[in-house]
Amino acid sequence: MLPQTVKVGAGRTSVDVVLSEDMIGLEDVVVTGYTTMKRKDITGSVSSISADRIERIPAYNITTALTGIAGIRMDGGSIRIRGTRSRNASNDPLIVLDGIPYDETLASINPGDIESIDVLKDASSTAIYGARGANGVILITTKQARQGKTTVTYDGFVGAGVNNWGSLDVMDADEYIAFQREASRAAGTWHSEADDAKAFFGIELANMGKVDNDWMGKYFNKKRLWTSHSLTISAATDKSAYKIAFNYKNEDSRYKNAGHDHFYLTADLSHKVLPFLKVGLSSRAYYIVKNDKPDMFNQFLHMSPLTQTRNEDGSYNVYPFGDPFVKNPYMNESDDVYKDKTEEWKLFLRFFAQIDLAKGLTFNTNFAYSPAFSSRGYYYDNRSVSYTDERNVAFMHNNRKADWVWNNVLSYKRQFDRHNIDLTAVYEMQNRQTVNASMSGKDQESPAYLWYNMGRLTDSKSLSSGFVRSQMVSVVGRVQYSYDDRYIVTASFREDGASQLSPGHKWAFFPSGAIAWRISEEPFLKDVEWISNLKLRASYGMTGNYSIAAYATAGTLHGKYANFNGGELHRPGLEPETRPTPDLEWERNKMLDIGLDFGFLKGRIHGTIDYYDSKSYDLLYLKVLPYTSGFNRAWTNIGDTRNRGWEVSLSTVPVETKDFHLGVNLSYYRNKEELIRLQDPKMKEDINNGLFVGYPVNGVHYNYKQVGIWQENEADLAAIYGQKPGEVKVADLDGNGKIDGNDRTILGTTRPDWVGGLQINAEWKNIDFSVDVYGEFGSLAHDGRSTSEWANQLGRWNTYKIDY
């Protein structure tokens, strides 16, 4: 805020001050690794999202707000920052909530509680988080109460949509009849309508001319609603502050008796006990109940338009074809046929204390405890599309977690004339513990029991349980020095010890360094009014990855029944599954980043340009072993990967008047991801494990190249390959006159050549309008349904209309 000077005259008993926004406000303060700093002092690559941006996207999951940020890509619901590095170890970024590593999903955080999100992308920014920062860091800062009167805020929205499968078109009754007859004619079983009994089920014959049932259209084109309601109460004085918030979200499903309900409760309290001591509690409770139904899209695609959904009495027709192997997909809507319910309870408690030891010297201690419990149960009987057994089945699984993190941060910030120094030292401990138990069985006495009375199951009972614990200890140091707001140097280190790895390999050291030059503060540019910011920066650092199962290096066994003495009785035993790997090393990542931050016309045009080059060494990989080894798989360090690319972000304010504001944000992101070395440097590919040097570690489409359809005038040539006209023509790449495994090739990858985003925000008085566009270009997608369920198959198994 800009400073204000107000004169106080004689007899004036109150003063009202309205602070005006300055270029350096909350949005210019960035959270970076256990501390905060002004954006102008940052030496690494950091992208930020404000609460305004989040509020303009009324979404259930704050992941939506991250789309469009340069360097971030959504991959199947997962967040990827600057590419994928590892094949089997985790590629997920670290989430830090109010300074504490947060192991739950972003969906468990109420978007309305968020003040800002800062995304750390380069190694100098993430190295301070060591092994957990290898895939980038997402720092979330929640809203706090502001000084003033008690405020009560309500926020809500309602969204509507349609479950539409796009342009998918299915056959009506007449088209289906013609298709069945033509298909049977081609198979030699149909010559005239007298042969219809060979092409159709009896029920279909009886319904010809009477029934034309659009199974899919009636089911999937249903309207859906999304609702969200938030209520917040907050107040603060110069000593105390509190904020209590409640949020409820509901999302309808495409299926009846299905949907998700989310409940959030937040309570933040802080109090300045002494002039030098501040304590507080931050708590977040999250409860979700999910009633799910199975994906029945394939089953609907198999339904004939000549069959009925319901019987004459209004009940569902269980077997529309009169065939026990083809059931009515609508049956799964009934809870006494199929019910799948999950409940999750999560609690996040953070106790903190801040002690001002001396001028510029502050000690912060944070202890976070996050217990969680989840319970899932499902039940379905033989009327369900998902089940073919004559008996019903019940299953239940309970999972209990108890994680805690304790970090102690000592920081020193001082300014001496033109010199600024910022020192940070951290000691951190983490503990994760999980206990789970599962039970399943068949032949429940009554559907009313569902999974709540597992003792009454009479067949195929199965019990299992597990316990997992992992720990980590870290020591962190960081120093930043700047001279005259022009030259900035940052260095950090982190030493991590992880229990997942074997003795002798548990510890790893991660250093980093960065420099920045604020060119706009040089005398030759400082007086150029249209340049508000120009900063050149470079960084280099190392991070690591140890994200494997807690006991992976020890090897595992699994149960198996076997015949030991040649008799008929099989007895339980154990056999090796994964081979012990006591020499497993840390996966390490080194990254170089060179960037330019710029701002013109007092910040109305600003942005960043970054080039980065990241190399990962000794990839953690769960390798498939040959049967002769006696093991199925083994963890190993297999090779190296590389991610390099460009990021460009541009924000502008083309129009700014008293009543109208127009903002435009553009982003561009290009990343080349490749495997550069296998465990054996002479190897260029490991087809058995899907690894190819020069290509991404996953997402590679390695298959036969289809070049068309064999035509009637190519019958002789097709016969050479054992094919005939009408079948798919596959390229004979090695030219040996036959199609075999040697004709497979790399068709492409799921990685896009580039990603772009556009955001437009217009505000007129109290009305705002926003548009968000996000696109990926150059990737190759494989649609499994197009090559299976939608493929050209005979008869009732496909009603998808194909234009040949």
What residue spans do the PLM features occupy?
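Conserved C-terminal beta-signal and adjacent last beta-strands/turns
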Residues: T232, G663, T749-F777
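Conserved small-residue
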Residues: T153-M208, S438, T636, W646, ...
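Extracytoplasmic gating/loop element in the C-terminal half of outer-membrane beta-barrel translocons
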Residues: A206, A498, E776-Y804
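Short aromatic-centered micro-motifs
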Residues: I95, R310, Y481, L733, ...
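Short, small/polar-rich motifs associated with maturation and membrane association
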Residues: M1-T266, V273, K278-G280, F348, ...
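Acidic, glycine-rich flexible loop segments
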Residues: T189-V211, W226-S230, F297-N332, K339
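Extracellular/periplasmic, surface-exposed regions of secreted and cell-surface proteins
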Residues: I54, N91-D92, H262, D268-L277, ...
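Structural motif
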Residues: L97-D98, E312, F416, Y483, ...
